[in-house]
Amino acid sequence: MKIPFIAIATVAICASCGPAAQNSTETRTDSATTSAVTQDQMIAPAKEIAPLPQPDTTAILFDTVTIEHPRGDTFDLYVPSGFQVAIAAHGMNRIRFMDRSADGRLFITDMLNLADNTKGKVIILEDPDSSGVFQKQSLYLDKLRNPNSLKFHKDKSGKDWLYLAMTDKLVRYPFNPGDTRPAGDAEVLDTYPDYGLSYRYGGWHLTRTIEFDDEGRLYISVGSSCNVCVEKEEVRASILVMDEDGKNRSIYAKGVRNAVGLAWTHGSLFATNMAADHLGKDQPDDAMFRVEKDRHYGWPYCYHWNGKVYADPKLDTASTKVSPHEVPGAFSYFGAHTAPLGLAWFGEHEAEDPSLKNYFLVAQHGSYSPAIGRGYSIQRVREGNPPEDFVKGFLDAKGNIHGRPCGIFSIGKDDFYFTDDKFGTLYHVYRRH
């Protein structure tokens, strides 16, 4: 399948400063009635943190690429000058996160739809043609409970596994190159609250996300059961850490309402986080954190907005367990309701182009209402600064939604995939040579 494009035209447009910058001059509403804690008043890191390499901060000039989607939609996307974006696969459903096996095939999760269901899949994509379009899609696993995240990992004995995070459990399957179905039964490593979307203490956030550190320890995020509440289950709104076999599980960090994106680089865990929805369309900020062990990141007692931390008036009582002074500052603030999901680091091994090298990329899924108009893009992120658009155009000027970015996966220098879980499409972004 070939995806036609019109000729590329360079457009001298600077990268968006992002919602966080747009909101920086807004006045506080009545919902923020307590004094704020500024970034320099927030608690210092508990340990020495390795600095990240500094990126080039030159503003991005964009090229326009017209996408003719096979579902009948034609729209423009905007990518940095010198880059291209194209459809690599389509015809799937709610595709989320991905990883590549040692034999070069791409494995991708598909949650089917927004409902709590057991019809999820893991799909294998392979045999890309000269245009980078995958010619073969095959089923690896099915009848899964909301599969969101998967990772390939070689354990300390040298055995290969495919790890898969679902609503109710974390499992792993033995894996051999060339496998078209699992090489053995699933080994259950951990289980999680599982009472459905309608149950206050057990519903809401159905996704789980996994990441490994340099020592092979496994991290998994478990979202809250509610918008704002004091949880009954300790694992809610947390990031857990455990050995690669599921043993020695402990809570790594608390107070992260829904950390869907995780990435390990330079000795630290980084996470995106979706904030609560009860304070209006302009607050609180969704954010990204450099996550430290045993820290509490505020939810439900505190929230971030415009670089400051506030006590949530809904829970600001004498029994409040966390004050704004105890909450670490964010790595970057995204603005309200951008819905940050997938997260990936692009260092010297993943990028050469200065517009991408030494930046994180974040998939901004987009606000629950297109009228709010935030997100719907891939943004580059550096510490202490608002995000900047890297791929944009999924929400057009008329309010039409052409996609909702979700997962990001690097496949080489200046070369990556990202998923659109609204229309089941995999996009390929690469630097033209």
Annotate each PLM feature.
Residues C17-A20:
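Bacterial signal peptide processing site
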Residues M111-N113, A165-K169, F175, G223-S225, ...:
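Short loop/turn segments immediately following the C-termini of beta-strands
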Residues Q135-K154, D160, M166-F212, S221-S224:
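Asp-box/WD-like beta-propeller blade repeats and closely related beta-sheet repeat scaffolds
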